[in-house]
Amino acid sequence: MKLHEYQGKELLRRFGVNVQEGKVAYTPDEVRDIAREYGQPVVVKAQVHVGGRGKAGGVKFSPTPDKAYENGQNILGMDIKGLTVKKVLVTKAVDIDAGTEYYVGMIVDRNVQSYTLMASAEGGMEIEEVAAATPEKIIKYRVDPITGLRPFEAREVALQAGFKGNLNKIADMMVKMSEAALKMDAVLVEINPLFVDESGTPLALDTKFEIDDNAMYRHKDLAEWRELEAEHPLEIEASKYGFAYVKLDGNVGVLGNGAGIVMTSLDVVNRAGAKPANFLDIGGGARADIVYNAVKLVSKDPDVKSIFVNIFGGITRADEVAKGIIQALNEGILTKPVRMRVAGTAEEEAKALLAEVNSPLIQMYPDMFQAAEAAAQEANKVEAK
């Protein structure tokens, strides 16, 4: 279950994280009233379950209550990537120049069956862009789900990432974020930016928080927070299949097994000159029917012009992946070019199955870089028409 920014901040606040003060508004009048109450410049932020709100005009600085009213009028009812803005978060503005922005996040990595902590001094940017341009600037650290993130580990990660300021305070916030992720069964928690002021005090300015749908029975008090109409239809469908799926802005569908492999796949697609249209982790040990459903899901996205499949077979058999893709092809569901790299268990069997089909839509490559390059070329070729 995806949470809105204000909901994610509320959960983090419950775990002791210092978050930016703000209130939710549903009308321009409410936006103005909140701005007047705060008595200082505010930021009006669209609350929708997609990224890129700022680029779409859904985040506006408002120096006065009247400007806040105007911005509220413009943002409420706005369409952002197919979702209508029905509410906004009005927060006290922060002077970004009077401090430093960082990034911290926790994600479930199915490959290592654990959480991975990520930290970067490149805060305020989309982490996918940082990963694509300068992956060395993202520090990753495996977090034991039994012990959680310990203070000395958090300090070491902050130091490696190049964080400045009071590292003890920053580490304390990272530990509390880790506690929130573990206790709330989150599959993703991000604080971006994590703002550190001149005194060294950290403040969470923006958040992403997503809870595992399979664990919602443990968090029945949050059930009323879910707004299906506020979620992308493909993400709703993905949750029914049990997929870890996130809709993105690009034109290349991405399908892989394990969060680490999928994150890497996003990076190589960016480097190849295209943009990923989604994050889709089919998990470990996926059978042909699971792969079939994954291909069907990605194929429904009109933004997808080609599909990049990146599988490293361990408990996931490559021939099962091939069977699922072939079934989608035979049923006429797969109509977009698939460029894939499959390695590991039953790799040769997969190659034999695909060679027998001999479809120009499906091509295999010896490594993920070549496959991603081919997928990017196919997608960009369609876009250029």
Curated annotation (Swiss-Prot):
Reactions catalysed according to its record: succinate + ATP + CoA = succinyl-CoA + ADP + phosphate; GTP + succinate + CoA = succinyl-CoA + GDP + phosphate
Job of this protein: Succinyl-CoA synthetase functions in the citric acid cycle (TCA), coupling the hydrolysis of succinyl-CoA to the synthesis of either ATP or GTP and thus represents the only step of substrate-level phosphorylation in the TCA. The beta subunit provides nucleotide specificity of the enzyme and binds the substrate succinate, while the binding sites for coenzyme A and phosphate are found in the alpha subunit.
Subunit details: Heterotetramer of two alpha and two beta subunits.
Protein name: Succinate--CoA ligase [ADP-forming] subunit beta
Record organism: Deinococcus geothermalis (strain DSM 11300 / CIP 105573 / AG-3a)
Cofactor remark: Binds 1 Mg(2+) ion per subunit.
Enzyme class: ligase
HAMAP family attached to this UniProt entry: Succ_CoA_beta
Keyword vocabulary terms for this entry: ATP-binding, Ligase, Magnesium, Metal-binding, Nucleotide-binding, Tricarboxylic acid cycle
GO biological process, one term: succinyl-CoA metabolic process
Molecular function via GO: ATP binding; magnesium ion binding; succinate-CoA ligase (ADP-forming) activity; succinate-CoA ligase (GDP-forming) activity
Pathway membership, UniProt: Carbohydrate metabolism; tricarboxylic acid cycle; succinate from succinyl-CoA (ligase route): step 1/1
Binding-site list for substrate: N257, G314, I315, T316
